[in-house]
Amino acid sequence: MARVFLFVLDSFGIGGAPDAEAFGDLGADTLGHIAEFCASGAGDRAGLREGPLQLPNMSALGLVHAAKLATGRLPAGMPLPERVYGVYGAASEVSRGKDTPSGHWEIAGTPVRFDWGYFPAEGDAFPPQLVEAICREGEVPGILGNCHASGTDIIARHGEEHMRSGKPICYTSSDSVFQIAAHERTFGLERLLELCQVVRRLVDDYNIGRVIARPFVGDNPGNFTRTGHRRDFSVLPPEPTILDRLEAAGRTVHAIGKIGDIFAHRGVTRLTKANGNMELFDASLTVVEEAEEGDLVFTNFVDFDMLYGHRRDVPGYAAALEAFDARLPDLDRRLRPGDMVILTADHGCDPTWRGTDHTRERVPVLMFGPSLRSRSFGIANSFAHIGETAARHLGIAPGPHGRSLL
């Protein structure tokens, strides 16, 4: 029996989505544009990084080849490696959104074929009757924000008034989300989480995918900082995922980071919380040592998306990729015969793109392990094939929406 380690580099798209134009994202390419900026010097930042994008380990696993499959061109400053050591390719999403739950659920074998509900971008984002119900049932004196916004911007804009008034900061984006920011000291973390549970129930009628708690600390706009106590309150996946199938087969599903929240904790048998990419990697390595035969270890590396993609920070994103890449040998040294690692992403978030939202892109799929021989599988027409590849490797029955890429 084998083990599978499924690592999602949140938002690390590689461009080329065949339906990108329908999402307003024609030409978006997270990897390609980061590489282009770095090759031109626009990705330099004093004390952080400089020069072309350096991802030698992922390149050796087929990343550059996958990018060329997705877009027809090589990322600037990233030559083809002399040898590839993994099974590689690109995957297109069939789910109707470009959001986190849709991407992860499809990776786990369950595409999202329905349309999420969204809040309007102009005027008040939330209907008056919803706001009234939130204030009444959540026992708050009102809300601030009530608009589409960047999380860091809206905290800077309304944070002080929130601390004075006790009104939570409520906002949304182009994703199907209702986000609530509140100060951990003056409002209270537990109170924020309780409010999110109230709102989760109230927005079910609007078909909203997630309610997200965004706690922060600080005493003025200059030092307001979001903490690592974020929580996502998601709806359940529409069908059983590979997590459910593994749980039913008596296997252990290790959910690291926000994976548990994304799947509403369904099919998760062991939860490990960690904050920040390096802490998430360390936690994953610990579980690699502990996981038993037949286990799935599923980690989301959120910083790429949360800290750099949405904030349109090219040098930060590039440095985070390079730091992640440098840790891969630590993982490789811990693998046992029969183990398989899958590196992929759930959507794009091109830091050079207009706005602050996700971008519709293909994603890389890089697989390696002691028993895998190098080859390309080409372009998969659904993320669901990723989950089915893991299912076959772990020896459980196939699901209805994909096939193994091996």
Curated annotation (Swiss-Prot):
Protein name per UniProt: Phosphopentomutase
UniProt pathway: Carbohydrate degradation; 2-deoxy-D-ribose 1-phosphate degradation; D-glyceraldehyde 3-phosphate and acetaldehyde from 2-deoxy-alpha-D-ribose 1-phosphate: step 1/2
SUPFAM superfamilies found in the cross-reference section: Alkaline phosphatase-like, DeoB insert domain-like
Transmembrane segment boundaries: none
GO CC annotation: cytosol
UniProt binding sites for Mn(2+) 2: 305, 310, 358
Cellular localization per UniProt: Cytoplasm
InterPro entries: Alkaline_phosphatase_core_sf, DeoB, Metalloenzyme, Phosphopentomutase_DeoB_cap_sf
GO molecular function: magnesium ion binding; manganese ion binding; phosphopentomutase activity
Keywords from the named record: Cytoplasm, Isomerase, Manganese, Metal-binding
Superkingdom of the organism of origin: Bacteria
A Pfam family that the UniProt record links to this protein: Metalloenzyme
EC number(s) from the headed UniProt entry: 5.4.2.7
The reaction(s) this protein catalyses: 2-deoxy-alpha-D-ribose 1-phosphate = 2-deoxy-D-ribose 5-phosphate; alpha-D-ribose 1-phosphate = D-ribose 5-phosphate
UniProt cofactor(s): Mn(2+)
Residue numbers binding Mn(2+) 1: 10, 346-347
Species: Sinorhizobium fredii (strain NBRC 101917 / NGR234)
The keyword Nucleotide-binding appears for this protein: no
UniProt function note: Isomerase that catalyzes the conversion of deoxy-ribose 1-phosphate (dRib-1-P) and ribose 1-phosphate (Rib-1-P) to deoxy-ribose 5-phosphate (dRib-5-P) and ribose 5-phosphate (Rib-5-P), respectively.
Family: Belongs to the phosphopentomutase family.
UniProt cofactor note: Binds 2 manganese ions.
Predominant cellular place of this UniProt entry's protein: cytoplasm
Gene Ontology annotations of biological process type: 2-deoxyribose 1-phosphate catabolic process; 5-phosphoribose 1-diphosphate biosynthetic process; metabolic compound salvage; nucleotide metabolic process
